[in-house]
Amino acid sequence: VKRPMNAFMVWSQSRAGKIMEQSPDMHNAEISKRRGKRWKLLKDSDKIPFIRAAERLRLKHMADYPDYKYRP
């Protein structure tokens, strides 16, 4: 069972197609670096919808898998 996405991952998933459209030849490592930089530059107020979405995912995950323990 996968862990629920955090706020950054929710935001990153929503942006996935945009970066690929702009730079289809860019490597995943570079895309990840750019997403990380953009996330850090976002205002806290702009992050709120993604934080709330991540919290909803976390609560649903807890309900769906009550005995889940993260084991890397």
UniProtKB/Swiss-Prot annotation:
Q: Name one GO biological process term.
A: neuron differentiation
Molecular function terms, GO-annotated: DNA-binding transcription activator activity, RNA polymerase II-specific; RNA polymerase II cis-regulatory region sequence-specific DNA binding
Taken from the record, one Pfam family name reads HMG_box
Chief location of this protein? nucleus
Quote the DNA-binding region ranges, renumbered to this chain.
Answer: 1-69
Compartments, as annotated in UniProt: Nucleus
Alphabetical UniProt keywords: DNA-binding, Nucleus
Query: What do the Gene Ontology cellular component annotations say?
Result: nucleus
Segments spanning the bilayer are: none
Q: Which SMART domains match?
A: HMG
In Swiss-Prot or TrEMBL terms, this protein is called: SRY-related protein AES6
